[in-house]
């Protein structure tokens, strides 16, 4: 299967409610040309180095000079020095500089506007792209945000938090341990929503097919 066919298949599956888009940090970092234009947010490696430099945390490198220290590990050590609120505000401040300016990947996805998009990113690039396209997109940060949300309304599930709530982002080792417990409920609701969404789509297709066959039957002599 070539790339073009893969893209067509993916688009079909999204339209049919069989696939969910997941955006990792790579989606918000941007291409080389976009980075040259000053667009995109910091990569995890860049953010790791920024935290280490600002809070005086030593970094570890392998024999080839590659960074071994992780964002989670460095952030955890920084929190021991200055506290979680200070470190998280610093992280979001560095992220904000790249917010509000969607990249090509976000604008392309907004044209498709799948019902559910999931991400571990803190930024608002996809939501902004949806706004620019004149489309509504509800930001889901916790399970309570799903209450009363219409089934077919586009939503962005922010699995690790959002820049508008800096103190609640998942960043350190202890954050992720607690998140695993909290996320179980959200994941269960997402799965249920997906199953319901697929069932509704199938029911709609069945109704259309039944209507078509009924019309064909009535036309028969």
List PLM regions with ranges.
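Gly/serine-rich nucleotide phosphate-binding loop at the start of the catalytic core
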Residues: 1-118, 123-134
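Conserved catalytic alpha/beta core of Sir2/sirtuin-type deacylases, generalized to analogous enzyme cores
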Residues: 1-19, 101-102, 107, 111-221
